[in-house]
């Protein structure tokens, strides 16, 4: 087994362990969100993550625990909470003692940082702090019965659309960003410049056909699985993972869509309070490892590790006109222009 700890890490951990009395306990996970307690020598890491990450983390966390046990002799257990990204960010910023936050978008990590719980530059870790990528796509049932091929098709009469609520869901904000950005791209192609009014109208016409706004991306996906709606706007990985399990969905990649990047960060105040910094840093490093990135890929995500992405690139299609958050001006501008009380999204909701 290739160690995910550096030599320096192993020395530091060994020194730590010689001063601790170890007890043997079974490795496991829990969804209890209380502050952690652990037997002397053992550790509990608290994970606060967005709902879509759960399936991958169900595989990743036990594997990391086994590696850590082999490296250090120490047993790690996990307390895990999975919520809509915005809800999770507010919980951590409000005092939920997560050691690691794995969320849908960097602006949710920024909320925790602004609340004073993340004190380091989390973007300096790994791939700019991002552990996975995806794109915003549309999903239909087998055979694509409504003939959906691009965003414009979602505006047709009789087409029932699903996506979650951007007030609570980071995935929903990616969905809105994708549709609004596609509207900007279309206006730019027609006139040579971005037209926010056109993009807003484009978003309004799609939203007119929305069947429901669920709390999270996972809740929206569950509704679709129960037969609600004709088409779902979601992460590509949500559909690919289900197709791999034999569910006959169709992935519709729009001409213009957004690159999704999902961050993870250590919550400094909490790891220092719990004495779990070394283990938390090792877990975060593990999430960037080839083993972990392959597990993310198995769950439909696009890896951030170049070697792993090269191995699996045949599993993904490249959109004709892929843009990232910088096309919309970055998250700071997007928060103000789209999601502030006077932003485009709330104007669309209010019919202004």
What does each model-found stretch correspond to?
Residues 130-135, 200-207, 214, 245-278, ...:
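Periplasmic-binding protein-like
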Residues 271-352:
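Extracellular/periplasmic juxtamembrane helices and adjacent flexible linkers that interface
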Residues 1-43:
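Short, low-complexity disordered leader/linker segments with a strong preference
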Residues 186-254:
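Ligand-binding pocket segment of bilobal, Venus flytrap-like solute-binding proteins
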Residues 51-55, 85-88, 107-110, 143-146, ...:
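Solvent-exposed loop/turn segments at secondary-structure junctions
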Residues 113-186:
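A conserved helix-loop-strand patch within extracytoplasmic ligand-binding domains
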Residues 27-115, 123-125, 235:
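Early extracytoplasmic/lumenal segment of secretory-pathway proteins
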Residues 95-101, 158-160, 226-234:
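Alpha-to-beta junction loops
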């Amino acid at each position: 087994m290739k160690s995910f700890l550096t030599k320096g890490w192993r020395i530091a951990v060994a020194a730590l362990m010689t001063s601790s009395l170890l007890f043997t306990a079974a490795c496991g996970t829990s969804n209890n969100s209380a502050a952690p307690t652990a037997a002397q020598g053992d550790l509990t890491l608290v994970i606060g993550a967005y709902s879509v990450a759960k399936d991958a983390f169900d595989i990743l966390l036990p594997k990391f625990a086994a590696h850590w046990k082999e490296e250090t002799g120490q047993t790690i257990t996990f307390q895990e909470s999975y919520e809509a990204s915005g809800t999770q960010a507010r919980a951590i910023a409000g005092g939920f003692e997560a050691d690691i936050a794995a969320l849908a978008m960097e602006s949710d990590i920024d909320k925790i940082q602004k609340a004073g719980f993340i004190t380091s530059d989390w973007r300096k870790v790994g791939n700019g702090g991002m552990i996975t990528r995806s794109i915003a796509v549309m999903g239909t049932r087998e055979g694509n019965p409504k003939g959906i091929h691009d965003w414009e098709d979602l505006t047709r009469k009789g087409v029932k659309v699903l996506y979650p609520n951007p007030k609570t869901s980071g995935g929903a904000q990616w969905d809105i960003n994708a549709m609004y950005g596609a509207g900007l791209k279309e206006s730019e192609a027609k006139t040579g410049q971005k037209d926010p009014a056109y993009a807003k109208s484009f978003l309004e016409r799609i939203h007119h056909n929305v069947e429901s706004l669920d709390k999270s991306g996972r809740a929206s996906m569950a509704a679709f699985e129960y037969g609600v709606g004709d088409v779902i706007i979601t992460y590509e990985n949500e559909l690919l993972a289900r197709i791999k399990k034999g569910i006959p969905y169709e992935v519709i990649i729009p001409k213009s869509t957004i690159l999704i990047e999902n961050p993870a960060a250590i919550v400094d105040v909490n790891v220092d309070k719990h004495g779990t910094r070394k283990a938390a840093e090792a877990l975060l490093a593990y999430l960037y490892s080839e083993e972990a990135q392959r597990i993310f890929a198995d769950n439909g995500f696009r890896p951030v590790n170049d070697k792993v992405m090269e191995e699996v690139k045949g599993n993904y299609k490249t959109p004709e006109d892929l843009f990232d958050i910088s096309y919309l001006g970055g998250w700071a501008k997007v928060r103000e222009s789209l999601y502030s009380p006077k932003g485009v999204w709330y104007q669309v909701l209010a019919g202004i």
